[in-house]
């Protein structure tokens, strides 16, 4: 199943009878380093060596952020099919609280490639750019084989 990430341990979403997501990083010591906010996915050809979706530029999903402090991410695995809206709402209704910066996404991918879903499934990272909500889909095909799409 696909995985999704949040940059902090926010859990104010409503419970459902059949959970949408299951946290698989509980008890792990994952830490995203502080960032200066300047790194952009569209410019990280050394990280995403297979493909960087040109829609990052076409959709104007290419905005630097403010610097961010160290963050403790949570990694979730999807338990059932759903929409992005329902999936992210199950973690937190306030999407601003679960959004990553592009610098944080890059930092996580570089530091924790083993937490990206193998076997051709995407790992989803919610982020905002210029007031719009996007999802970065990161695919890991093995060491040095990453690509990223935006939707």
Regions found by a protein language model. Give the residues of each.
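A binding-site-centric feature that preferentially detects glycan-recognition modules on secreted/surface proteins
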Residues: 1-98, 102-151
């Amino acid at each position: 199943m696909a995985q999704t990430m949040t940059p902090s341990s926010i859990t104010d979403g409503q419970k459902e009878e059949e959970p949408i997501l299951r946290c698989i990083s509980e008890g792990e010591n994952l830490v995203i380093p502080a960032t200066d906010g300047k790194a952009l996915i569209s410019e990280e050809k050394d990280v995403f060596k297979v493909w960087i979706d040109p829609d990052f530029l076409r959709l104007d999903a290419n905005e630097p952020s403010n610097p961010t402090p160290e963050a403790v991410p949570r990694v979730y695995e999807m338990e059932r099919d759903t929409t992005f809206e329902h999936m992210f709402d199950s973690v937190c209704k306030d999407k601003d609280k679960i959004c990553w910066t592009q610098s944080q996404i890059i930092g996580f991918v570089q530091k924790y490639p083993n937490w990206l879903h193998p076997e051709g499934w995407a790992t989803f990272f919610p982020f905002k750019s210029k007031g719009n909500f996007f999802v970065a889909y990161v695919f890991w095909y093995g060491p040095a084989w990453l690509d990223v799409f935006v939707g």
